[in-house]
Amino acid sequence: MLRIAILGRPNVGKSSLFNRMCKQSLAIVNSQEGTTRDRLYGEIRGWSVPVQVIDTGGVDKDSEDHFQKHIYKQALAGAGEADILLLVIDIRCGITEQDAAIAKQLLPLKKPLILVANKADTLKDEHHVHELYKIGISEILTVSASHDKHIDRLLQKIKTLANIPEIAEEPVEEIEEEAQISSHEILSPEESLSDYEEEEILFSKPPASDKPLKIALIGRPNVGKSSIINGLLNEERCIIDNIPGTTRDNVDILYSHNDRSYLFIDTAGLRKMKSVKNSIEWISSSRTEKAIARADICLLVIDATHCLSSYDKRILSLISKHKKPHIILANKWDLIKGVRMEHYIRDLRSTDVYIGQSRILCISAAKKRNLRHIFSSIDELHETVSRKVPTPVVNKTLASALQKHHPQVINGRRLRIYYAIHKTATPFQFLLFINAKSLLTKHYECYLKNTLKTSFNLYGIPFDLEIKEKAKRTN
């Protein structure tokens, strides 16, 4: 994989360039300095090799500010792991002392280095290019990230430096011919889907993918999300402080554990709109829900020393809304004294209907207690979500439930379930064919869902019952 790091002092347009290169808005862009605090990871798609772009925070080497020291450390780490470095400056300001200091740090790394003179919005701005060579970097390109100007030229220069070949395009005629052949092979001319009974239509899990499992860490500010990431990875990847909202962007972190790849999405804390005081915090809050939608599995981090808050319940309802498998991580467990873990979990389950259906793991990021169980819990949950429940097992389970608690008689009729299938895994859904929807009460539907949940260990997996009426077949 080719890795490209974007570096520079604050407010020169690094995040705008990052978004242009990745062709999506992954980094928050704002005129306020220090918007990007952690390393952000994106990818350039459509190249012949995998390409990762690393956006780093604005570097101020001499600052005594607590955050700036962390940002400087993160930026150097990003430069260290990259193959190609992009030093971004504001061409309207020329070469500043900060720009020169950063270049002095990067040149000894002996890596391909491009000086990207950003904010060259007009031809007049580009007239000052010759003045930039005094910084000691031979490769200089002018761009305007905000106007999408010369970005393609920059990408082509990166390809040249990295010796990346272009992808040969397949002729349109060959693609169309292949599509026509494939469509004819689906069914023979004598067959159609109507020839098959619904019972015979099989639903199987998708083929195994080598893509990383996307894990979103969700939670209100200051519950320890970044501490958990750093504890899992044994590396300080996310800036940590006791000020709520330290992480503003969603930070993508790729990690391999036991031959499996995980993409952790460390999110900004989600807050009620009343507490969102500026545009950056609002964008961060909205991105939390986007991270939920993007993830394969969500880890909801709560503070074990506090009661479940309305924020926590709101986040959990968002996870349920998006039908995402999830695990609740009760962090700061080391601060709980005199309470047995099973009693805490039991009491926590009783506080909210969604909590009662969730998987719960008590951990301590500060003491690194039970962190090793997070990976095994993720793997177990993913395996449960990925499997297909055999149709005979589904029907046997529901038949047993009907026998155990008979549905009530309504207008002289009783509910009958002819058959059921596990229809889809993402989202998890069962399809039931019954005699009449009017005979399935909400109470009894809840009973059937609880039966399926306990029988197939579907805790932490929101699922639905799709109900279809099927008239009794007469010969």
From Swiss-Prot:
One GO BP annotation of this record: ribosome biogenesis
Record domain KH-like: where: 387-471
UniProt keywords, alphabetically: GTP-binding, Nucleotide-binding, Repeat, Ribosome biogenesis
Domain of life: Bacteria
Residues binding GTP 1, per UniProt: 8-15, 55-59, 118-121
Domain EngA-type G: 2-166, 213-386
Family matches, as InterPro entries: G_ENGA (IPR031166), GTP-bd (IPR006073), GTPase_Der (IPR016484), KH_dom-like (IPR032859), KH_dom-like_a/b (IPR015946), P-loop_NTPase (IPR027417), Small_GTP-bd (IPR005225)
CDD domains in alphabetical order: EngA1 (cd01894), EngA2 (cd01895)
Record: residues binding GTP 2: 219-226, 266-270, 331-334
One Pfam family named in its UniProt record: KH_dom-like
One example GO MF annotation: ribosome binding
Record function comment: GTPase that plays an essential role in the late steps of ribosome biogenesis.
Subunit text: Associates with the 50S ribosomal subunit.
Family under the similarity heading: Belongs to the TRAFAC class TrmE-Era-EngA-EngB-Septin-like GTPase superfamily. EngA (Der) GTPase family.
Name of the featured protein: GTPase Der
Organism: Chlamydia felis (strain Fe/C-56)
Upper taxonomic lineage: Bacteria, Pseudomonadati, Chlamydiota, Chlamydiia, Chlamydiales
